[in-house]
Curated annotation (Swiss-Prot):
Compartments, record wording: Cytoplasm
EC top class, as a word: oxidoreductase
Job description of the protein: Involved in both the arginine and lysine biosynthetic pathways.
Protein name as annotated: Putative [LysW]-L-2-aminoadipate/[LysW]-L-glutamate phosphate reductase
Species this chain originates from: Pyrobaculum calidifontis (strain DSM 21063 / JCM 11548 / VA1)
Statement: the UniProt record of this protein carries the keyword Kinase: no
An MF annotation (GO) of this entry: N-acetyl-gamma-glutamyl-phosphate reductase activity
Pathway(s) it belongs to: Amino-acid biosynthesis; L-lysine biosynthesis via AAA pathway; L-lysine from L-alpha-aminoadipate (Thermus route): step 3/5; Amino-acid biosynthesis; L-arginine biosynthesis
Origin: domain of life: Archaea
Active-site residues per Swiss-Prot or TrEMBL entry: 151
Lineage of the species this protein comes from: Archaea, Thermoproteota, Thermoprotei, Thermoproteales, Thermoproteaceae
Matches recorded under PANTHER family: [LYSW]-L-2-AMINOADIPATE_[LYSW]-L-GLUTAMATE PHOSPHATE REDUCTASE-RELATED (PTHR32338:SF11), N-ACETYL-GAMMA-GLUTAMYL-PHOSPHATE REDUCTASE, CHLOROPLASTIC-RELATED-RELATED (PTHR32338)
GO CC list: cytoplasm
Family to which the UniProt record says this protein belongs: Belongs to the NAGSA dehydrogenase family. Type 1 subfamily. LysY sub-subfamily.
């Protein structure tokens, strides 16, 4: 039984970590921190947890976290880096859901996250495992510092990974992403208020979005060469979910059989990835509607011979597979639990 502390447990991601870990047979949640809600019952902030826990929020301190064997950091970017060195040095396993240990180049944090200087702990950065289980499974076994990938990066990387791995990417892919309002977090801003967000389809950070750094890092690793990506996200009028479409212009068109072979080679054994390309039924390509509440990734593709283009698709729940669920999946592999422990959720439909 692993004793777990969730630091930053009052936000959407923290709430999802609680929801999942409270159902995990190998975990005891001993600590949930929140400066704002210190002393309050967890279920008063996360009403869906009423009747499942009597846990109260505590002040976020290193001492509180060190009562656990494993710490999940659900903190804003730039905050986790203040916690990780001492936790790691104390022997605690850390699963960081911020971006603070995702990028391998210390200098990348200056460009992509506007840090005033390169990453202050390059040694820990080198030790951190990028926590995308399907692509880093062997590295995750026994890992003590895991950087959980970003939500839109997760969908983008997984849908393009087979094309990168099997040499189809010669020109920069173009990625269009759409994300629900929960991606902005529990605090939000004025544009996340109901009157602004309802009916919206709005681009934001249309160039140089920070998730590009992760996408390029991982696709370059798979391709064995530098891969650059044109990426534009959009805020849309849903609460949960991410849908990404990738456009890959190729030198030589693959066949449909080739693409099935590539996707199955990379993801055929995955417990959570479904290849959705059907000739019948009401959902012939991936659809956010049919992954909500789950750790599933639905991937699909189509061929455009006229334009020598492969179109790829991915649908995930941003709070589960894009954050808490992927963190627990990585935790399970690292700690020797069944990979799907606590994550056997069939998506809710209709919704």
């Amino acid at each position: 039984m692993k004793r777990v502390c969730i630091v930053g447990a009052s936000g959407f991601t923290g709430g999802e970590l609680l929801r999942i870990l409270l159902q995990h047979s190998g975990v005891e949640v001993v600590c949930a921190t929140s400066r704002k809600f210190k002393g309050e019952y967890v279920y008063r902030v996360h009403p869906n947890l009423r009747g499942f826990t009597q846990l109260k929020f505590v002040e976020p301190t290193i001492d509180a976290a060190l009562k656990a064997d494993v710490v999940f950091l659900a903190l804003p970017h730039g905050e986790s880096v203040k916690w990780v060195p001492q936790l790691y040095e104390s022997g605690v396993a850390v699963f960081d859901l911020s971006a603070d240990f995702r990028l391998k180049d210390p200098n990348a944090y200056v460009e992509w996250y506007k840090w005033p200087q390169p990453h202050p702990y390059p040694d820990l950065l080198a030790k951190a495992v990028y926590g995308q289980p399907e692509l880093h499974r062997e590295e995750l076994v026994g890992a003590r510092l895991v950087a959980v990938p970003g939500c839109m990066a997760t969908a983008s990387i997984l849908m393009l990974a087979p094309l990168a791995k099997f040499g189809l990417i010669s020109a920069p892919p173009v990625v269009d992403a759409k994300i629900g309002s929960s991606g902005a977090g529990a605090e939000g801003s004025v544009v996340d208020l109901h009157s602004f967000r309802t009916y919206v389809v709005r681009p934001y950070e249309p160039v140089h979005h920070r998730h590009i750094a992760e996408i390029e890092q991982e696709l370059s690793r798979l391709a064995g060469k530098e891969v650059k990506v044109a990426f534009t996200p959009h805020a849309v009028d849903i609460v949960r979910g991410i849908f990404t479409t990738g456009h890959v212009f190729v030198e030589k068109m693959p066949t449909e059989a080739d693409l099935w072979k590539y996707y199955r080679a990379l993801f055929g054994d995955s417990k959570f990835i479904r290849i959705v390309k059907d000739r019948l039924g009401i959902s012939r390509y991936p659809n956010v509607k049919y992954v909500l509440g789950s750790n599933l990734v639905d991937l699909g593709f189509e061929l455009d011979a006229r334009m020598k283009r492969v179109v790829t698709f991915a649908a995930i729940d941003n709070l589960v597979r894009g954050a808490a669920g992927q963190a627990v999946q990585a935790f399970n592999i690292a700690m020797g639990f069944p990979e799907d422990e606590g994550l056997r959720h069939i998506p809710v439909a209709p919704i």
